[in-house]
Amino acid sequence: MADKKDFAFKILSDNRQAGHNYFLSERFECGMVLTGTEVKAAKDAKIQLKDAYASVLGDEAWLLNAHISQYSHGNRENHLPVRNRKLLLHRREIDKLQEITREKGLALIPTKIYMKNGKIKCEIAVAKGKKLYDKRAADKARTADDEARAEMRRRA
């Protein structure tokens, strides 16, 4: 039997551009409704979240534009790479997300997809788009930190 640590935590896909393009605030963990070949492809880390976003449509939360490549050993029953996937959340969380997305300028962005105890989970974050000058300021601060860190290493 497999050890418990084998199922602990494994990141399958990470949306690195989300932190660069958005101010991320509150985060939610949710399950996903996937087909069998999607699960197998996801476990092979064949997921792209670059243009993906989440939305509350009706009484359900959905992950839109996420790309899960077709499973390499799949047959004619293989899944479509880009389709809407239902997110599994508690009712109060869905209601909260619906209130949040009504505010102008806020969106729901998937930040990562990971395995937790053998189940595939998606982390979505409430996001507000950054302007170009915000991105420049963040880059400037990052380079200043890097230079200071390099200078400290040289002196030590």
UniProtKB/Swiss-Prot annotation:
Region named Disordered: 135-156
Cross-referenced Pfam families: SmpB
Single GO molecular function: RNA binding
GO biological process, alphabetically ordered: trans-translation
CC per GO annotation: cytosol
PROSITE patterns per the UniProt record, alphabetical: SSRP
Keywords: Cytoplasm, RNA-binding
Subcellular location: Cytoplasm
Family annotation (HAMAP family): SmpB
UniProt family annotation: Belongs to the SmpB family.
Function: Required for rescue of stalled ribosomes mediated by trans-translation. Binds to transfer-messenger RNA (tmRNA), required for stable association of tmRNA with ribosomes. tmRNA and SmpB together mimic tRNA shape, replacing the anticodon stem-loop with SmpB. tmRNA is encoded by the ssrA gene; the 2 termini fold to resemble tRNA(Ala) and it encodes a 'tag peptide', a short internal open reading frame. During trans-translation Ala-aminoacylated tmRNA acts like a tRNA, entering the A-site of stalled ribosomes, displacing the stalled mRNA.
Protein name: SsrA-binding protein
